């Protein structure tokens, strides 16, 4: 910095105000009518967003529930859910674990973090397993592991392909 720039900087008055972040206007709309994109902040009509498979124009992909993914993938009405495996819910006896599972079941409407079943795509049969991150962050416990293994055994015994969508937060 030369001498002239130093003098100019010395006599410049500092800003006496602090810029405030603009608040976004609140939209008075019925619950669930609009969905805001966390990436571009655009407000979508939820129905239109769902018709676009939950993908915003900016490219952001909203999380999908297991049943939504199944409905997008397989032929309409072809999905037959497999019965869940019989495994101990809390084999390591973690405290409050059963209560957490109960809350997740009530909140999500699914039994565990994976949904498995038989379906068709363009009339071709297959076995599909879809993990749902809403349930214990899609983590893999004994039930999830056994459900996937059982689905693969079923597919193998019938010579069917397996499609597996993972959305796991790890093991539990």
Give the ranges of each region predicted by the language model:
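Terminal-region recognition feature
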Residues: 2-172
